């Protein structure tokens, strides 16, 4: 019996529970309880989107390569049952390649938009953490002012004091606490997710500072000397009769809270928060709406034909129609058994492995192409992937034409 790591077991259970549950927020969303876990969630989604882009691109490239290989094979064996089988697979692969290209094209804008939004949101959260990690305020630069009636009807003392916050760097979230295992399946759970969880927009504001103000006396005339960094006073400093200043300034710590934002309402993705048609820069609703939009494109990429079996193609309408045409039957045939039989007649039994039977032989270097005075020996697989594709296709087409002419004489 194979052993599983603790992490693998936990991920398996999370995946199992996720598939067993109905629509709702999964473990990933529920694991977001503060700024750091929200950052972890956004990072996970960014990584998943990068992976999805690679998968969609790989599907297009793989199917395009398979289509070229099968097209060469169909040309080589044209006029035979083997040629008809390769022609059928060429048709099926062509349809799949077109679907894969469309799938990627439709997903590009949504994925790039989501990546931009998640990166922006993550930077905003990181900036908020750094702002609140500033070191203790420094009070200095006291400067005597002229009393007016700005605050009270009659003012006796006035002093301007600077409160400076030194720049500081917050501990990285990954150092503070690694990403939770519960967040890892974020992309898989997105399809049934109802909410995005994160800190509210109104949490993004400068720290609150409490100033400890102290005054002594009521005469401004004798406050002619600044002898203290924190206060304006008489020349005798702390023992003087008149003075005013700030003793301490204390920055209030950030109280981290998170809330839920619906991804959609009545089938429509959540709209960004706006004021007079202008989107707020800090916008949790926008992030929720972007998640709603991008999940429509996080579908399984179109599968390669090489990994299929004949059994996985017999119910494919495109494969059935192509098989009927190649077998000289009417494409309007509605009998399911006859449509399936047309496919198996050309490709073999349902258990037949497409890669082994049809792609395997294409790796054999049995193709001799005479280009100029030189003869190049290659395989269909190599020719399809390189600069010899056109030459190989022309060669096989010419050979097939010769066979046709010979047969008609």
Question: Which residues does each predicted region cover?
Answer:
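Long non-transmembrane domains of secretory-pathway and surface proteins
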Residues: 1-409
């Amino acid at each position: 019996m194979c052993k599983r790591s603790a992490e693998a077991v936990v991920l398996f259970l999370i995946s199992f529970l996720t598939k067993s549950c109905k629509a709702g927020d999964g473990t990933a969303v529920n694991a977001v309880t503060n700024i750091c876990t929200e950052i972890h969630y956004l990072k996970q989604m960014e990584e998943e989107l990068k992976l999805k882009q690679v998968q969609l691109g790989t599907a297009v490239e793989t199917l395009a390569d398979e289509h070229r290989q099968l097209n060469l094979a169909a040309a080589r064996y044209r006029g035979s049952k083997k040629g008809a089988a390769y022609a059928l697979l060429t048709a099926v692969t062509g349809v799949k390649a077109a679907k894969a290209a469309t799938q990627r094209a439709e997903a590009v804008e949504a994925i790039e938009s989501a990546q931009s939004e998640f990166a922006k949101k993550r930077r905003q959260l990181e900036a908020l953490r750094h702002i609140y990690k500033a070191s203790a305020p420094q009070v200095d630069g006291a400067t005597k002012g002229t009393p007016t009636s700005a605050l009270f009807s009659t003012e006796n003392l006035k002093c301007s004091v600077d409160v400076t916050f030194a720049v500081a760097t917050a501990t990285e979230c990954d150092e503070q606490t690694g990403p939770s295992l519960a967040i890892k399946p974020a992309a898989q759970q997105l399809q049934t997710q109802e909410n995005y969880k994160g800190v509210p927009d109104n949490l993004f504001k400068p720290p609150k500072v409490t100033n400890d103000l102290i005054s002594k006396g009521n005469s401004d005339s004798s406050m002619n000397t600044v002898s203290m960094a924190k206060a304006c006073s008489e020349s005798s400093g702390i023992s003087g009769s008149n003075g005013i200043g700030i003793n301490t300034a204390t920055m209030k710590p950030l109280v981290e809270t998170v809330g839920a934002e619906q991804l959609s309402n009545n089938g429509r993705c959540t709209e960004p928060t706006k004021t007079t048609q202008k989107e707020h820069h800090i916008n949790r609703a926008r992030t929720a709406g972007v998640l709603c939009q991008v999940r429509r494109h996080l579908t399984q990429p179109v599968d390669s034909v090489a990994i299929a079996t004949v059994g996985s193609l017999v119910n494919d309408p495109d494969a059935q129609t192509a098989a009927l045409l190649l077998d000289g039957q009417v494409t309007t045939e509605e009998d399911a058994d006859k449509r399936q039989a047309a496919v198996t007649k050309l490709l073999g039994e349902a258990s037949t492995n497409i890669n082994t039977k049809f792609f395997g032989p294409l790796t054999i270097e049995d193709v001799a192409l005479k280009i100029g005075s030189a003869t190049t020996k290659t395989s269909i697989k190599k020719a399809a992937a390189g600069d010899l594709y056109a030459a190989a296709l022309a060669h096989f087409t010419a050979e097939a034409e010769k066979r046709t002419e010979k047969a008609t004489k």
